[in-house]
Amino acid sequence: MKEKKNKKFALGVEYDGSYYHGWQSQKGLSTIQSEIEKALSKIANHQVNVICAGRTDSGVHSIGQVIHFTSISFRSDFSWIVGVNSYLSKNISVKWIKEVSENFNARYSAISRSYRYIIYNHKCRSAIFRNRSNHVYKELNVDKMYFEAQSLLGEHDFSSFRSSGCQSRSPFRTITDLNIRRLKNLVIIDITANSFLYHMVRNIVGSLIQINDNTKKNYIKKILDKKDRNYAGPTVSARGLYLFFVKYPMCFNLPIFKDDFII
């Protein structure tokens, strides 16, 4: 009897992280990874293990998570998507699937990752946006925040924005894009880098929120130059953070699924 050949697949996943203990599987806890692996295993009729582009913390959301897995089972793309989604809660959804070459790796093949942080900026908190954004009651100076944030562009030692417990060997990262805009009561911060340190985005946002009309010029640059976590702002809530998009080389021809507005 001919042995079935393993095939590798990439999968695009969207999820609301409010109800899970982060991405990574943990014994006795409900996580995004464990839920997806259980659903995939049922459809594949064998144990499936997945690798993701970026492990998100408890409370962090995603519309752009990419994972890969291997399977000996044959299913159409439609059958994979509908089948897996039927075993997932409504807080997790598979958006696309594509067979990929053996050399594809969801984590190591990624060129860059983009995160979005959403702040509900109003004197009164929102019940609707409670788990989708971070509430800041003082009015934020978005123009000044944007100006200060530009000092983070390029390759730097981001030790000032690196939380304890970070397992990365190097504090150097390269931010290629950082944009901040206001949409009525929402302040939207988009950051793209080759990769991120532990809590790096949330610590950057925590520092930007400290900026006000009286903040002296080069506030963020001075924090960056200190290379000391004690000088940066607090780590902001996970509920405002989204893994927005993961970029891969064109040769893999992965679908691009990127919503501009994700509340």
UniProtKB/Swiss-Prot annotation:
Gene Ontology process terms (BP): tRNA pseudouridine synthesis
Entry EC number(s): 5.4.99.12
InterPro entries xrefs: PsdUridine_synth_cat_dom_sf, PsdUridine_synth_TruA, PsdUridine_synth_TruA_a/b_dom, PsdUridine_synth_TruA_C, TruA/RsuA/RluB/E/F_N
Substrates-to-products reaction catalysed: uridine(38/39/40) in tRNA = pseudouridine(38/39/40) in tRNA
Transport listed as a keyword: no
Sites where the protein binds substrate: Y115
UniProt GO molecular function: RNA binding; tRNA pseudouridine(38-40) synthase activity
Active site positions, chain numbering: D57 (nucleophile)
CDD domains: PseudoU_synth_EcTruA
Function: Formation of pseudouridine at positions 38, 39 and 40 in the anticodon stem and loop of transfer RNAs.
Family: Belongs to the tRNA pseudouridine synthase TruA family.
Protein name: tRNA pseudouridine synthase A
